[in-house]
Amino acid sequence: MSINNATIKRIAKDVKYIMANGSSLSSENIYYKHDEENIMKGYALIIGQRDTPYGYGYYFFEFNFPYNYPFAPPEVRYLTNDGAMRFNPNLYINGKVCLSVLNTWAGESWTACQTIYSILFTLSTVLCANPLLNEPGIREDHNDVHKYNYLVTYKNVEFAICKVLRLVCFDEDKSFNKGDVMIMKLFKAILSETFTNNKEKIVEFINANRVKYHDLINVSYNVNSVSTSVSTSVSEANSRRHTRRTNLHISVYNLKYDLDYDILKKLVYELNIA
């Protein structure tokens, strides 16, 4: 199918606007690069805000534009994805991004007035302080809201920061999707600069969240009843670092993880990005 000239002109207009207003995006830790060979593709990086569970994390998206753009929305694929962890109700482990503006979620649907620029800001709002509240029917008093924030905070450092940097800067995991890694590498300079500038802040972020979620550290969860019990005494926890572990279960998505907060700072400190 040939590409409509109106579609080409509109995509070019959207990209030109982003280039002219890049500072307003970067000030919100949003970055966009359009494919230099295929006008129907674009790529985005959103760095999580510090006051959310996504703090300093690198979240990548691929845009695939339809031949009738802007009368239909682009298909947006989520790339910061290990295939197991559900980082957000709107971000599926198969890469699907569910947003009303993309016609993939209930609510106000896509119109031709929307642009790449507006989509980027909408995506950034998904990475919010209490992401589980994006799930229909979940209220602030739900048992999983606090636990899910804790899990996302942990996996954000482990995967969206440390693993992503190892993939991009050190080619660590050859089994990871090569195409996705190539997209991530388009932003390598930004990753290197921001991590170098924020390394100590990331450690502070880890420490702050360790205090914030102190009630969940050293707590094990019965995955059937989702009840809690303290696994070790405070004195034992202070004397035995390996006991600072949480067996966490998020019933909404049936996520089960063994978390050890002590390893996160080590993962960060081991990263030396030139």
Task: Please identify what each model-predicted range represents.
Residues M1-G57, N68-A274:
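UBC/E2-like fold recognition across ubiquitin and ubiquitin-like conjugation systems
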